[in-house]
Every structure is written in structure tokens, then in C-alpha cells.
């Protein structure tokens, strides 16, 4: 093996040049992908030992690099001899996991013209080959083992050097990279063929590319070899790092590209409860912090009055004497039971005997807003300690209720005269224990009702009962000999049962007995007794509980053998009297809420007013007929704790206030994404009633294609309606965003569900009044659901006028609604026909840019919307049926649902081409619309839009006529270079107006 000190001048010349270039080359700079080195000749400090044939061809020489490290190179320079065929074969190279292999060559090459006498024999290229094998061919064997190698390429130098370059020490090193593959065997040899060049191989580097091991999205991905095909991506599943977890059904994945780069990350991992993300790993929440769910990115400090003493806490425990309610989320502060109510006061009314209480809220609410009050009534003896008391029992009535009071006042009825009562008022909240009402956090008063006659019903004796008289007796309320015992006077009130208590008779007596005369035979009477006791003034006490006594019949006192016909007659008359009384009550009865159809006329309302109907499950409860809307809402909607609703972002303003997206966390249920409608603080009383009416309306519906009400929040300063979250928003906007991405069959598939929902509503007797695609919401799984239930009869006045947003309710309203303000299920059918047209037209505005007044006139003249592009004929005929002028001729929703379901299952085959199908005539062909003025040119049209700056752009693009402009699309405007969104929107609006003008002139409407 020769070195750089060899005697041959050409070799010495080549050796010096090659070594100087190698020193300047330095270490190779890697790319962004990871390269797995299979061979690097510069890394070998020993002889390479490659096979050279013949022996006087390629030769190995040694030198040093810039770090004085030895490097091995091969050179050949037999340029003066013809017919050169010198081969150099590397050792066996294992391909490892690589299939697509890269070969990087660094070499120098002498310019043949700079070598005297070598013009006919010198070459400036050399060839590179490879041969796949399963094992090493070995050294010293015949060239490449006799097998046929595959040529990689003929290599030429970009720059060659001359004698002058060598003298000036100019370095001209060439680098070429070639790739081979895909390889299938375990390894391969490289071979270099010299055909007469003066060349030096400074470096041979063989490698394949792989995506380096990495951590992304808290998932580790192993090093992965790239595929051989350039367009092939290798999907690699990631492994979540410690203390993290993947999303269910969406494990973390990435794709390794052919160039060794990671592409298309899908999914990610989230730190488990108790851990938070810190770079590429999850760290435990420190003491004092917690994380309850993987959905939360960071640990949160413990809420007030709670603590977390350990690392990785998933919740914070409450401090001593503090607690959380079962309905409180883990993020809620710990609270405690309230203190006792303050300043408990009472007033006692003697006639009737009524005890009224009022108090102030506790000084300490425990940190909660859900403070309620509970009353405990104890009846005590006239003498003795309060410990001798016993519960009052069911006799005493509490208004408005005994427990769960939010009011700070209560009234007790049916107390006994001459008794002593102790009433305790306890303050409770969400963390009060079950025995809190009997605990120590209460205020109490003790009240004596004074002497009286606390008789039970069985303490009044029926001494004698005759056809026209009744004798009663009772015990004296004050024992004989006690002060005032002889001064007690009694009042006895009586009346016929079934008669009003206002038509009673009264007798008085000084003894505990009485005989009442002049009664009717065989008649049931009600008797009540009370005592008047002495004092500074005679105090009238309340009457005792009523007792009933029936006088005997005339025949009963004379003969027991009297015919039973008289008894039957008396009973019959009594029954008729009772029935008459009941009917009288029903005749004047007024119920707080009316059940019936939401769209009935005045005659229907009269009928409902005078006839009682038992409400059924499928009968709509009209909010306008309810006296107490809040109470009605609680009958149909679940009351939610405001703390269970977390607001995340605003979705804009609603009819009554803010509309937000949030999360609902209920005990035992997963967190749910919801839409929250909040009533603004400045809302008027009428807006508050409208808000409650919308909640009551939503709460009555249970259908898979009607927006679901999750609950309401009515306790607190902010009223909320919580519904399911529909991620794709309104149907019209969804269709516009996906125009051209859905085929006609997919569009038609949206309609049967909506028809089913309207069938459900019509069967309940509900009239929507505002049916339109903008009031249909689309969920994340592309289910359409009816919404927009906040409209009512008060909204009728807007039916004719165009709104500021460009939406005119006249576009969806039936003729009878526009003319007479009459809403019915049939008017909803008309609106549903417009919805079907909107769906098939990808959310296009009905009647294009026609004003509300023009639409009213056109519909009255018989104009109907033409079929949208690719709309099946059967579906358009159904639309026309929905747009019949006579409401009685329109189909019912049950029929519409049946027809649409059959269309989806068995679509109508086209009967003719779109261009040959006959179109019915339209009366609009002969009538001009004043709404759309005529323009003489494109320039005049642009000036009318105040966008004349684009005249040259339109002209340069060939849009010289209004007919051509009418066919433009949004993409055409972008291609003109119109970058401002507001200008594009103004132009699109003007183009739509031109299209409507063209349709008017061409008569593309439909006459009915």
C-alpha cells in the first residue's frame, strides 16, 4: 500500500490535492432526519482493505484530517494508458432495517486538458455499481463474485482541478449523493469502475434515513425506518409517557415520511388526574394543588378551606368543620353550616288564631348561597319546663311550607287555644347534616295562645240527635274553681255541609253544652265551637276542628218499618244537591295553566276556558296561560346548581342575553358540553317572562330531533337555560360551509328527522311560528335538531319587514300569516317547504335578494321557488304541495315524514335530463321588479356598489357583460385579486341580485 510520499508525479499531485480537500471538508453536517450510518470510510483508522482489480488500478493511501486523525482514501490515475477497466469493491455492507439506501461520495477529479499527452485516453467520469447478497462475498475473490452488478450511475465532477489549482492550493471537492433500493437481501457490496480518469475517492458514506425517536404530545415514538417508496407514510403508534393516558378511541399516532420526518400527528396523551404537563413528561401536583380530570391541563390550587397534603392529589379534602355538598364539584370551596337566624320575631292573631314569624338571615352563611330555613313546632304544657314539649303533629299547618324555606317569614295555622308553643327556626345550607334542624344552630320563640278550648274531635259528645235538633257537650277548658272558670262563654257556629261557610248560624252559651234546634231533617250539618276567656278584654279564640252530625229523617223517629223509598228519595235529593254544588264550583273555576293547541283561534280559547280537559302527555302547556311561570318551569325542567355549570367561551348574544359554551358536571355523570343561555341582568320583566316561557316550552319536548333541555338555573342572580351543545351551529351556515361536499342523497337524508320532529310537535298541538334553517342546529354527529322556541304571538308584527341582518321572516311565512297574522300547523308546513328548499340549495337565501315586500307580492301572484340544482322532481313536487295557497290543501307533517322516508329509502330515478325537463310557466316573466334597477354596463354596476376601483380588474379578466358577471363565483373574485373580505361580500351580494334579475327575465319560477 502506497502513501502520499510515492514517487509517481501524478499520484503525488493527486494525493496532495485530495488530502487538502479532505482537511477542509471537516465533519459532515446532518440534516433534520436521523441518518443510520452503514459505512463511513472516514471513520476507519485502519486500512479499508477493499478489493481492487487489477492490482495496478485503484490503490489505498493514507493521510490525516484537520484534527490530525488518519483517514483512508482510494485513488487511480492511469490516464496515459488506453482501455482502462479498474474495479474497486467495498466490503459487505449490512443494510440493517433500511430499504432505501443513500450513497454519498466525496471525490476530486483532474481536468484531462491539464494533463499533457492524455487527450485520447483520459476520462472525466467513473461508474458506481452495487450488488445485493445475503452474505459477504469475501476478499480476493473474482470481481464481484461473477454476479452481474446493478449500475447506480455514472459520476461526473461539477468541478475538476488543474495543475495551476494545485499550485495555488485551490480546493475543488465534489460531493454526489445517489440512492439505491428498495433492497430485499441482507446486505450489498458497492463497486467503483474507473475507465481512465484521474480520480481520488476521499470519502464513501452509506446510510439510510429514519424518523428519530421523539416525544410529542406526551407520547413517545420509537425510531422508525422510512419506507422505500417516497409517497409512503409509515403509521407508528405512540406510547403515553408515565402518568398520562390517551383519549378513548383515539390513541396517539404519527406517520414517518420517506425523508425521515415525522408527519401528520393524530391524537395525544393527557396527564392523568393528579399530574400536570411539564415539557415532555407529567409531574405530580405538589401539596396544596390538585387536578381532578385529565381534561384539565394544569394543577389548580386547592379551593378555600381545603387542603392537599400529598403529591399527585386528585382532590382537596376539607378542613375541620368544613365540608362539600354532594352536588358541589371538586373545584368548589369547602363551606360550613350557617349560624342561627337573627332577630326572630312573632305576632299572634287571636281571631283567627294565627302565629306569624319573621327573622333576619344568619350572620354567617357558611360561605354558601343556598341557605334555607326549617321550622320545628313543639307543643308544651301550660306549666313546666320546655323539655316537657312534644311535636305539634300534622294538625298545625305551615305557610308557605315547613322546610326548604327561602323566604324569611312563615305562618302557623290551626294552633290550639290555651296552649304554649315553642317554635324553632333553623338555618340550613348544602352542607348541613340531616339532624341540623334539631341541632344548636336555631333561633326559637315560645308563645302562649291563652286560655281556650283546645278540643279534639272525639272530646265533643253527640248527646242527642233528632230530626230537627242536635244536643252537644264538651269538657270545660278551664278546670272548675280556677280563676275565670265561671266567666267562660262559648260560641257555636253551624251550617249545612256543602254550603259556603259564610252562610252560617251562631248560638252562644255559658255552659259546656248546647242544643241547636230548627234544623232540617235528614241533613248533614257542620258544627264548630270556640271559647271566649276573660281578661283585660274578651279575646276570641279560634274554632275547634269541625265535626259533622246528620239529623234523623222524619220517618226514622216514628217507625222503623217505614218504606225505604223515602230514604232513597232523600239520598237522591242530597246527591243532586252535592252534584249541583260541584258543578257550580267547576263553572267558576279558573285554572292557572291552560292545556291546548298553541295556535288555536279565539273560538278554541273560549272552549278551553269553559271546559275542563285532563292534560295528557302529548298535550302542549301554553306558557301564556300560566299564572306562575316559574312554578310551571319546575314541573318540566330540572333545576341545576349554578356551580355545576362552568362557562368556557362566549358564542355571542341571544334574544335575552349572552349565549355561552360551557360544561355541565352532574354527580355520577361525565362532564357534558352544553350551551348556556343567560338572562342579562338588565332584562325587563317581559324579557324575564319570555325567558321562562322558552324554558317551559323546551322542557315539554322529548324527541331525538329537537334540541334537548338539560336543565335550568332559576335560583340566584342569573337565570340560565342549559341545553345540549350543537357544535356545527345553524343548518344554513353549515350547508354554506360545505357547499359542493354533499350529494343530493346526503342532503335529503337530513329531512326525515326534521319532519319527524315537526310531526311530534304538531301532534302535541304546538305551532313553531319561526321555522327556518337558521333555527335548525347541527350536532357533532351531523344530527339536525329543531330549535328557536323563543318566538311567540308577540313576534307576529315582524313578519312583513326585512331585518337589519337581511333575513326577512316573510321569506318563510305562509300567505295567511302575512295577511292575517294567523299561525297554525299548516303555516308551519309552508315554512318546512322553505327549509327543504334551503337544504337542497346549500343554505342559499330563499328568493335570493328580493325584499320582503317583493316576496309577498310574488307569492300572492303565484310565484314559487324553482327546484335547486340536482333536486329530485319528487322532492320539488312535495315543496310545491307545502306551498299551496289554501292551508287545507297542504299535507300534514305525518304525510311529509312518510313521503321523505320513502324518498330516502328509494330515491326517484331521473325521468329526463335537466335540460329537457319541461318547466311550468311563471307569471313573473312579464313583470319587472323595481327592486333591481337596470344597469347599462359592468362599470355602472360597480359604481352602484361603490366599488368602481375594480373596473380594470373585471375588464382585464373578460367580464364585459352583466350576464357574465351574474355567473361569477366567490373563487372568481379571489382570482381577480380582490383580497378584502367585505368587498368580496358586497360583490357577491350584488351578483346574487343580478342572478335573481336573470331568473326573473328568464321566467324560471314555478306557477301554482
Swiss-Prot record:
<feature type="region of interest" description="Disordered">
    <location>
        <begin position="322"/>
        <end position="342"/>
    </location>
</feature>
<keyword id="KW-0812">Transmembrane</keyword>
<keyword id="KW-1133">Transmembrane helix</keyword>
<dbReference type="InterPro" id="IPR013761">
    <property type="entry name" value="SAM/pointed_sf"/>
</dbReference>
<dbReference type="Pfam" id="PF00041">
    <property type="entry name" value="fn3"/>
</dbReference>
<keyword id="KW-1010">Non-syndromic deafness</keyword>
<keyword id="KW-0325">Glycoprotein</keyword>
<dbReference type="InterPro" id="IPR050449">
    <property type="entry name" value="Ephrin_rcpt_TKs"/>
</dbReference>
<keyword id="KW-1003">Cell membrane</keyword>
<feature type="domain" description="Fibronectin type-III 1">
    <location>
        <begin position="340"/>
        <end position="452"/>
    </location>
</feature>
<keyword id="KW-0547">Nucleotide-binding</keyword>
<keyword id="KW-0418">Kinase</keyword>
<feature type="transmembrane region" description="Helical">
    <location>
        <begin position="566"/>
        <end position="586"/>
    </location>
</feature>
<dbReference type="InterPro" id="IPR016257">
    <property type="entry name" value="Tyr_kinase_ephrin_rcpt"/>
</dbReference>
<feature type="glycosylation site" description="N-linked (GlcNAc...) asparagine">
    <location>
        <position position="311"/>
    </location>
</feature>
<dbReference type="GO" id="GO:0016020">
    <property type="term" value="C:membrane"/>
</dbReference>
<feature type="domain" description="Eph LBD">
    <location>
        <begin position="35"/>
        <end position="216"/>
    </location>
</feature>
<keyword id="KW-0732">Signal</keyword>
<dbReference type="GO" id="GO:0005886">
    <property type="term" value="C:plasma membrane"/>
</dbReference>
<dbReference type="GO" id="GO:0005005">
    <property type="term" value="F:transmembrane-ephrin receptor activity"/>
</dbReference>
<feature type="topological domain" description="Cytoplasmic">
    <location>
        <begin position="587"/>
        <end position="1008"/>
    </location>
</feature>
<dbReference type="InterPro" id="IPR001426">
    <property type="entry name" value="Tyr_kinase_rcpt_V_CS"/>
</dbReference>
<dbReference type="InterPro" id="IPR027936">
    <property type="entry name" value="Eph_TM"/>
</dbReference>
<dbReference type="GO" id="GO:0005524">
    <property type="term" value="F:ATP binding"/>
</dbReference>
<keyword id="KW-0829">Tyrosine-protein kinase</keyword>
<keyword id="KW-0808">Transferase</keyword>
<feature type="domain" description="Protein kinase">
    <location>
        <begin position="645"/>
        <end position="900"/>
    </location>
</feature>
<dbReference type="InterPro" id="IPR011009">
    <property type="entry name" value="Kinase-like_dom_sf"/>
</dbReference>
<keyword id="KW-0209">Deafness</keyword>
<dbReference type="InterPro" id="IPR036116">
    <property type="entry name" value="FN3_sf"/>
</dbReference>
<keyword id="KW-0677">Repeat</keyword>
<dbReference type="InterPro" id="IPR003961">
    <property type="entry name" value="FN3_dom"/>
</dbReference>
<keyword id="KW-0472">Membrane</keyword>
<dbReference type="InterPro" id="IPR000719">
    <property type="entry name" value="Prot_kinase_dom"/>
</dbReference>
<keyword id="KW-0964">Secreted</keyword>
<protein>
    <recommendedName>
        <fullName>Ephrin type-A receptor 10</fullName>
        <ecNumber>2.7.10.1</ecNumber>
    </recommendedName>
</protein>
<dbReference type="GO" id="GO:0005576">
    <property type="term" value="C:extracellular region"/>
</dbReference>
<dbReference type="GO" id="GO:0030425">
    <property type="term" value="C:dendrite"/>
</dbReference>
<dbReference type="Pfam" id="PF07714">
    <property type="entry name" value="PK_Tyr_Ser-Thr"/>
</dbReference>
<dbReference type="Pfam" id="PF14575">
    <property type="entry name" value="EphA2_TM"/>
</dbReference>
<dbReference type="InterPro" id="IPR001090">
    <property type="entry name" value="Ephrin_rcpt_lig-bd_dom"/>
</dbReference>
<dbReference type="InterPro" id="IPR013783">
    <property type="entry name" value="Ig-like_fold"/>
</dbReference>
